[in-house]
Amino acid sequence: MKICIIYHSETGNTRHVAQHIASAFDAQLVEVTDTVSYNRLTRFLVLCKMANREEKTVIEPASVDISGFDLVVFGSPVWAFKPTPVIHAAINGLKGCMSKPAVAFSTHGGRPGKTDETFKKWIEERGMVLVAITNIHQKDIENQKKTKEVVALVQASVKV
């Protein structure tokens, strides 16, 4: 089974989880980034406001063709209790995604808020099927038990 992991990471937490999943499945990693350069303060002020409004930003790569994959995994930090504008743009720019099964995870330092329902909405708007979703608090990022739970969630989704 071919798995593609598309993720956005600012502090490295989401990247760490994505890499852990990729190593367990020999999956392809695609890190999406914002093309606009922000300083630390403006990045969170501007992008958190955009996240709250469920807006998208301009990203690199602008689109990802997932037609050759059997499962796609999305990863995002939580900003303003929702996934980031970067991952929103990535989902919106997908090619070959109709009817693909998807798994989503988020990393956060507080609470996930409306992240799950927002991820679900965006994924289903693109014609994909969300088969699993989870959230990981930043204090659990290095926790082997928690990362194994995420890998097990993806493994169970592979069997769907």
Model-derived segments and spans:
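Alpha-helix N-cap/loop-to-helix initiation residues
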Residues: E10-T14, A80, R111-P112, K139-N143
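Conserved short-loop catalytic and cofactor-binding motifs
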Residues: K2, G75-V78, T107, N135-Q138
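N-terminal beta1-alpha1-beta2 submodule of the flavodoxin-like/Rossmannoid cofactor-binding fold
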Residues: M1-G75, F81-G93, K148-V160
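Short, glycine-/small-residue-rich phosphate/pyrophosphate-handling segment
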Residues: V103-H137
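A charged, well-structured terminal subsegment
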Residues: V129-V160
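A glycine-biased structural micro-motif
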Residues: M98-K100
